[in-house]
Amino acid sequence: MSEPRFSYSLAQLQEMSADVLRRAKDAGATAAEAEISLGFGQNVSVRMGETETIEYNRDKGVSVTVYFGQQKGHASTSDLSPQAIQDTASAACNIARYTAKDEFCGLADADLMAKDIPDLDLYHPWALSVDEAIALAKECERSAREVDARISNSEGASVSTYEGMFAYANSHGFNGGYATSRQGISCSVIAEEADSMQRDYWYTTARSAKDLDSAAAVGRLAGERTVRRLGSKRIKTARVPVLFEASLASGLISHLVSAISGGNLYRKSTFLLDSLGKQVMSSHITIEEQPHLLKGLASSPFDNE
């Protein structure tokens, strides 16, 4: 794992987070939490063999949440200067003073704070030049278009890199953070046959570029998936078993996750309201939460509570 390439070190972000908490406490807050994040990356796209876009992004932000008993206030800024942080903490406190009390407001209990923060191997920067990214994107698109003569057009291929750093602290004494990366290659093409036109895509994404599928493999699969759609037709309405491919099956699970999320339950905006203890999915389905998978795209050593 390479050293992070950020404007601030993780230790500096953690000190800034602690400073936010001190400012909130001085303003009268009984509890507070702060998040500070940095991120930068690039995205290159090509279409029909020509470079279409070269984009760079760099962002940063501070988010402050304060509690005056059971009154809550929140404010954020993209300016990391000491004065901006002071103003943001003050704004959050001013908001909290005028909000209604909510019996469920507050930090998670202190004994629920993470004690050990494991290294999940989430940071693998990809020192990819723009020219190298363009070459990979062109290779990906070319591979897709060579799959079949019926592939007549392209929506493009892209190569992206991203690095981020995050720190979180709260008034229970917790202060932690980590760096992450995410790399990706994608392609989408269009195929025609008679009066039928179909499009499909494929992509690969990973924490480390070494774990990505090759650009040629991504393009080839995008082309094969597109051609496979040609000749498709409606079927009659029927009650039959349905087999979903992996990329669609995960979407079905996301509906369940959304339905049982705390926010939706609190707002009573879920179809699973009052379903605690009830069977809501097929008995052969088991869902496990594994937040500590090494290099996992959704892995995290701790959450924001």
Where are these regions (language model features)?
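Active-site bordering "gate/hinge" segments
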Residues: M1-N304
